């Protein structure tokens, strides 16, 4: 299973094609739209989110609410394109018409300068339109689709914000994932700690007032995963490596860890390895310091993945840059942006992880029909229970 996205930030819209999804999977489009709505929310978002009201339009691969096995195409309209039709038109522009909103002053921290150098774009808008995080709306749609597939085999995902602007949320325990999800969905910054949420929002307000931006750390948990997804036999088959690559592909993410991650540098092996036990349901671990992976394979414990997002590079008090036309020093271009997108980014990270897990399930148990996948997963769970 794989997917491709296409589209620019201020173009007509975003297209995503999912290939290799099983036939016979019932899909609720309203659930996909609900995930897209969550992505647009969160304290610190900019004015763009007041313009867009993202919803998917299915253009292939789903008939009467069920996948057919053919490539699935989603379309998400960019409502803001109305204001950018001339700037983003596909047709050649007449020579006597000035190109509007041309970008010649790259923003530090963005793809602008290096992208222009690589593809020889003298108008850096050709870079920033595609490198924009607007593309993540398409990936959230893919992830929402994959979450419905995973639900059919007993796998669920949950994401939340741990840190914003240096303010850290305290850990909490809940009786169920549903209870924890309700708390996160009710939080303006998608965190489990209400007191920390207030401090995080103050940090966001301070950054906005100063024309600055702040980043943070997001966490994703995956529950119900069977042991043995991924493989130790080749470097590129390790599932934790695939997830790490997927997370690092999300705009502005600069680091990823599983379980206690970098904290393990300060602890002896006796405190970070997870003891093995055997019971009525087969093998288990007495702890989960390693975050659900050993040797690049799932252990059956929840996957625990944390990732750090840098502050958004677009600043309303821009840093020094250089005009690529004149080579003179100027302040960087200002584009409409968020002060903090960490809450929304937690949903994007969850989405890309959902895709990697769903892809691995299909590669392990087949991807022709959903019923066959479910049957094979049930057989595998029973096999491992008595192994």
Curated annotation (Swiss-Prot):
GO terms, molecular function: chorismate synthase activity; FMN binding
A family per Pfam: Chorismate_synt
Reactions catalysed, as given in the entry: 5-O-(1-carboxyvinyl)-3-phosphoshikimate = chorismate + phosphate
Cofactor note: Reduced FMN (FMNH(2)).
Residues annotated for FMN binding in this entry: 130-132, 251-252, 295, 310-314, 336
Keywords on record: Amino-acid biosynthesis, Aromatic amino acid biosynthesis, FAD, Flavoprotein, FMN, Lyase, NADP
Single Gene Ontology BP annotation: aromatic amino acid family biosynthetic process
Cofactor dependence: FMNH2
Pathway entry: Metabolic intermediate biosynthesis; chorismate biosynthesis; chorismate from D-erythrose 4-phosphate and phosphoenolpyruvate: step 7/7
EC code: 4.2.3.5
GO-annotated cellular components: cytosol
Residues that hold NADP(+) according to the record: 39, 45
Gene3D superfamilies membership: Chorismate synthase AroC (3.60.150.10)
PANTHER family with a match to the protein in the record: CHORISMATE SYNTHASE
Function (record text): This reaction introduces a second double bond into the aromatic ring system.
Family affiliation: Belongs to the chorismate synthase family.
Subunit structure: Homotetramer.
The protein's name: Chorismate synthase
Species, as recorded: Exiguobacterium sp. (strain ATCC BAA-1283 / AT1b)
């Amino acid at each position: 299973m794989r997917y491709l996205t296409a589209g620019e930030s201020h173009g007509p819209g975003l297209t995503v094609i999912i290939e290799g999804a099983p036939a016979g999977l019932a899909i609720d489009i309203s659930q996909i739209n609900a995930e897209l709505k969550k992505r647009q929310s969160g304290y610190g978002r900019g004015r763009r989110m007041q313009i867009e009201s993202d919803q998917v339009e299915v253009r292939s691969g789903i008939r009467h609410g069920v996948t057919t096995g053919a490539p699935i195409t989603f379309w998400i309209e960019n409502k803001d394109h109305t204001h950018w039709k001339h700037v983003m038109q596909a047709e050649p522009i007449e020579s006597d018409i000035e190109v509007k909103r041309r970008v010649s002053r790259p923003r530090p921290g963005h793809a602008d300068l290096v992208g222009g150098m690589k593809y020889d774009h003298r108008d850096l808008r050709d870079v920033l339109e595609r490198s924009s995080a607007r593309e993540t709306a398409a990936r959230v749609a893919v992830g929402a689709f994959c979450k419905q597939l995973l639900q059919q085999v007993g796998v669920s995902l949950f994401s939340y914000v741990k840190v914003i602007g240096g303010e850290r949320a305290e850990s909490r325990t809940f009786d169920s994932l549903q209870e924890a999800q309700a708390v996160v969905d009710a939080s303006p910054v998608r965190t489990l700690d209400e007191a920390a949420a207030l401090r995080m929002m103050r940090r966001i307000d301070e950054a906005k007032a100063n024309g600055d931006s702040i980043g943070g750390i997001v966490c994703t948990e995956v529950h119900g995963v069977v042991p043995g997804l991924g493989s130790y036999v080749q470097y590129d088959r390790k599932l934790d490596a695939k997830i790490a690559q997927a997370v690092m592909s999300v705009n502005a993410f600069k680091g990823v860890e599983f379980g206690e991650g970098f904290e393990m540098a300060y602890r002896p092996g006796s405190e970070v390895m997870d003891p093995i036990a055997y019971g009525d349901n087969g093998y288990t671990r007495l702890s989960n310091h390693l975050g659900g992976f050993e040797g690049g394979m799932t252990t059956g414990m929840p996957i625990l993945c944390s990732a750090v997002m840098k502050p958004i590079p677009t600043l309303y008090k821009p840093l020094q840059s250089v005009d690529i036309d004149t080579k003179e020093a100027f302040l960087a271009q200002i584009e409409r942006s968020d002060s903090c997108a960490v809450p929304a980014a937690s949903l994007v990270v969850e989405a890309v992880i959902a895709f990697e897990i769903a892809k691995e399930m299909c590669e392990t148990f087949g991807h022709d029909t959903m019923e066959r996948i479910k049957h094979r997963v049930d057989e595998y769970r029973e096999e491992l229970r008595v192994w």
